[in-house]
């Protein structure tokens, strides 16, 4: 085949597919008595790409990753939280195994196991859910429980969560029904008191009631393409029993509720057993003893807790874990910034004392891993501002003094030809 813009004897040529002349298109490719224009070639490419997109998820479904494989993938991106990784891997594996073997098995219908993650801010709750969804190649969306209200009140309806999930997969209902929904700040919709109130709690217990059916499994009616609901509109029917819901929250103060129940090292009077400082349990140890009754006392209604049978607790990250997070995962912060500097042909080096100082700063802010990026961004801001305008920089080094704000990153310049000839360093 060869390009042909003029026919034999000056004859005008046309595309054999769309009929456009050689003057209406940029390129006309000639074959044996056949011509095809660049627009038709591009259209054919688009059709092939669409078909590949449709086939690839089906191929991914052929083999469901085992809990060991899921855990290994989480290890690449999430540091620590070993118990939570194991619990999540098994729960996610069982959920998708249930979907693949739909229908009762020997008269036994498999129940749905949604997940509740309990852990402090910046401990990796969102990252765990997001990493699993990416690995399984399923749609994933996040919702903030604090923005949800009961239907009829100002705020987001719970159905909006399904709307967001549909948007992630171009309103493909089948894809959405295999998705994962992460609802953050679930502890913020706890009941305001232990006793049911006569006043309406539209952002607390009311939202829990509204989420019940959605999480357990119902057919949600969602308007197509984000349109507002009105009687003439056809709704998309989404079966939420196939969607995996993961709820997460910090549950500040829950450890006190657990301690009251366990009565370890508490009490008053001469006969009370009081633990010394070295004997006191860490918060993660206390949270790992959580029972449904503790969550009820905290403010979640029993029916809601019943829809989240799998509970995993995450430990607060210590200094060593934060140092690992900075440098070890596949998408570690230091690797991300090194890649940014590499685009300017500059090598970026973080020294060990710098990593330790960054981790200590994050610990003092009590923001967990979430605070690491803002610290690193602040350290490198001036350097990233000046670097594109500077010539000959080959390396930037960050040490402890840079993190403490005592000095700027050390810039190492390339040796020029004239310096090399004169022997200057």
Curated annotation (Swiss-Prot):
GO biological process, one term: cell division
Binding sites annotated in the UniProt record for Zn(2+): 15, 18, 37, 40
Gene3D superfamilies: 1.10.8.60, ClpX chaperone, C4-type zinc finger domain (6.20.220.10), P-loop containing nucleotide triphosphate hydrolases (3.40.50.300)
Sites where the protein binds ATP: 120-127
GO molecular function, one term: zinc ion binding
Record's keyword annotation contains Lipoprotein: no
UniProt keyword list: ATP-binding, Chaperone, Metal-binding, Nucleotide-binding, Zinc
Residue ranges constituting the ClpX-type ZB domain according to the UniProt record: 3-56
Pfam families: AAA_2, ClpB_D2-small, zf-C4_ClpX
GO cellular component: HslUV protease complex
Superkingdom to which the source organism belongs: Bacteria
Matches recorded under SUPFAM superfamilies: Glucocorticoid receptor-like (DNA-binding domain), P-loop containing nucleoside triphosphate hydrolases
Family indicated by similarity: Belongs to the ClpX chaperone family.
Assembly behavior: Component of the ClpX-ClpP complex. Forms a hexameric ring that, in the presence of ATP, binds to fourteen ClpP subunits assembled into a disk-like structure with a central cavity, resembling the structure of eukaryotic proteasomes.
Role played: ATP-dependent specificity component of the Clp protease. It directs the protease to specific substrates. Can perform chaperone functions in the absence of ClpP.
Protein name, UniProt field: ATP-dependent Clp protease ATP-binding subunit ClpX
Organism: Shewanella amazonensis (strain ATCC BAA-1098 / SB2B)
């Amino acid at each position: 085949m060869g390009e042909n813009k003029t026919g034999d004897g000056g004859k005008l040529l046309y595309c054999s597919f769309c009929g456009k002349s050689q003057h209406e298109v940029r390129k006309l490719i000639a074959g044996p008595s056949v011509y095809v224009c660049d627009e038709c070639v591009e259209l054919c490419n688009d059709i092939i790409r669409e078909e590949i997109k449709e086939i690839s998820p089906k191929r991914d479904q052929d083999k469901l990753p085992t809990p060991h494989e899921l855990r290994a993938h989480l290890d690449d991106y999430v540091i620590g939280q070993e118990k939570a990784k194991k619990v999540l891997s098994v729960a996610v594996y069982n959920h998708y195994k249930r979907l693949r073997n739909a229908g009762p098995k020997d008269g036994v219908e498999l129940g749905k196991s949604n997940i509740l993650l309990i852990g402090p801010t910046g401990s990796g709750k969102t990252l765990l859910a997001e990493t699993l969804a990416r690995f399984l190649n399923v749609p994933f969306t996040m919702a903030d429980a604090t923005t949800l209200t009961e239907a009829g009140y100002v705020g987001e309806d719970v159905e909006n969560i399904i709307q967001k999930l549909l948007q992630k997969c171009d309103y493909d209902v089948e894809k959405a029904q295999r998705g994962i929904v992460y609802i953050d700040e679930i502890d913020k919709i706890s009941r305001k008191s232990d006793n049911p109130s006569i006043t309406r709690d539209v952002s607390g217990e009311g939202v829990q009631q509204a989420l019940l059916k959605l999480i357990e499994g119902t057919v949600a009616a969602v308007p197509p393409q984000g349109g507002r609901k009105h009687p003439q509109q056809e709704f998309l029917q989404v079966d939420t029993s196939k969607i995996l819901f993961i709820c997460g929250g910090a549950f500040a103060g829950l450890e006190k509720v657990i301690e009251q129940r366990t009565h370890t090292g508490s009490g008053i009077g001469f006969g009370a057993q009081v633990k010394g400082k070295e004997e006191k349990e860490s918060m993660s140890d206390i949270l790992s003893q959580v029972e449904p009754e503790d969550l009820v006392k905290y403010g979640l209604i029993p029916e809601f807790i019943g829809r989240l049978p799998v509970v995993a607790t995450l430990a607060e990250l210590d200094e060593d874990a934060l140092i690992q997070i900075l440098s070890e995962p596949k998408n570690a912060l230091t690797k991300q910034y090194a890649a940014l500097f590499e685009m300017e042909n500059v090598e970026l080096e973080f020294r060990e004392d710098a990593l330790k100082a960054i981790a200590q700063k994050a610990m003092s802010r009590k923001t967990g891993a979430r605070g690491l990026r803002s610290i690193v961004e602040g350290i490198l801001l001036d350097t990233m501002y000046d670097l594109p305008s500077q010539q000959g920089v080959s390396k930037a080094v960050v040490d402890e003094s840079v993190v403490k704000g005592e000095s700027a990153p050390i810039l190492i310049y390339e040796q020029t030809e004239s310096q090399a000839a004169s022997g200057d360093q």
